């Protein structure tokens, strides 16, 4: 709520500055402009060999669509929230009962997840009904 108030104040200040000719505008240098391709769903696939920090970046950067995801037992799972942990094991291995997954460097603690066709769940609720357990490896699962 505070951020929206600050943004509203800033917009009013900027509009006033424009009308008072206090803003300097510069045309973009088109020779330095770059093009970003459309993000496709496949870019959201998680590579467990990557660093945990990079995977968290993918989760945050691709949220909510297309999302960061992995396959397990024929179903696609989208991770919506996660955090970095310092534990490690073989990349892709679930290393504890809270579904913490080891990555190339460190691990991620999954906090919120969604199985395809199902509702979003916090990890505590998800654990109660999943086959993803400690010791399972999510690479090629």
Can you say where each PLM-predicted feature lies in the sequence?
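Active-site-proximal loop/hinge segments within enzyme catalytic domains
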Residues: 1-85
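An anion-binding loop in the catalytic cleft
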Residues: 49-141
């Amino acid at each position: 709520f505070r951020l929206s108030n600050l943004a509203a104040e800033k917009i009013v200040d900027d509009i006033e500055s424009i009308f008072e000719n206090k803003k300097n505008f510069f045309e973009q240098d088109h020779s330095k402009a770059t093009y970003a391709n459309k993000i496709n769903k496949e870019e959201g696939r998680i590579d467990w060999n990557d660093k945990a920090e990079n995977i968290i970046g993918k989760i945050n950067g691709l949220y909510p669509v297309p999302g960061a995801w992995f396959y397990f037992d024929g179903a696609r799972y989208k991770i919506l929230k996660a955090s970095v942990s310092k534990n490690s094991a073989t990349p892709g291995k679930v290393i504890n009962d809270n579904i913490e997954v080891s990555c190339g460097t460190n691990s991620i603690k999954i906090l919120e997840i969604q199985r395809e066709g199902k509702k979003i769940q916090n990890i505590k609720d998800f654990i109660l009904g999943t086959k993803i357990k400690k010791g399972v490896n999510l690479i090629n699962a």
